[in-house]
Amino acid sequence: VTPAQALAAVKARPWFYAFELPDGTRTSCTLPPAVQPIHLTRRRVLREVLRRHMPDAAALTALDLGCHQGYFSVELAQWFRSVLAMDLRMEHLQDTELIAQAYGLAHKVRTLSGDVQTALPADALRADFVLCYGLLYHLENPLRVLRWIAQICQRALLLESQILPYELTGPIEDGQAHWARPIQGLFALAGEDAACDTSGTSGLALVPSLQAVRTALQAVGFASVTMIPPDAGDYEQFARGHRVLVYAEKG
């Protein structure tokens, strides 16, 4: 398939994302207009992080976890030497491959079918930079996945997640009244529509609070964890504290 043929195929159907295509056009987007800015905020922060923290990206590798239709995979491919795009659903990987072909980036984007919640071999998936957008809050086992990410991430992680907009502090008794452990974050149990192609597959998910994200990332091995504040004009959920972007570096 040539880039021109792939571009024609991309333009012939609607997408979850408003891709800005190489010929200057945009794909038809299935998201409501009020929600589409979420992707622009995610992309803005990704670009700022790469400019500030990864000046040598052209010599490095990237991993896009839960790549969906490849919107951020092709963005990463414009910065990094190579990109591995991973998703559980085969149709998403096929979309990612088509988009990469349309952008003329197929030689830099490789796809992998896999479930981040199963025991995947960390050695085969190591990457300098890991992108984890819109995935954590769809998972039944987020802590296990964060430990796995810490194993495969060689340098830095950029994570975006829906979060609980509130926290709970205080002690949890541990055996008797005078023994206690401090609360270090919350997880809320939420249902998932397994039939929806943007949801998890188990029917349940644990949605973290902001403190839970911070505590977990530090506990699994990230030496530096930075919450990225929203800019004026960013997607409204970031401004209201219902969604967060986090940059974390290994020691």
Region spans (language model):
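Conserved SAM-binding strand-loop segment of SAM-dependent methyltransferases
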Residues: L105-Q117
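Conserved SAM-binding motif I beta-strand of class I
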Residues: S82-L88
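Conserved SAM-binding loop of SAM-dependent methyltransferases across substrates and taxa
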Residues: Q69-F80
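Conserved alpha-helix/loop element of class I SAM-dependent methyltransferases that forms part
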Residues: P37-A59
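Short conserved loop adjoining the S-adenosyl-L-methionine
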Residues: T118-A124
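Conserved SAM-binding loop
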Residues: T96-E97
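Conserved class I S-adenosyl-L-methionine
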Residues: A59-H68
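S-adenosyl-L-methionine-dependent methyltransferase catalytic module, highlighting the catalytic core
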Residues: L131-C132, E140-K250
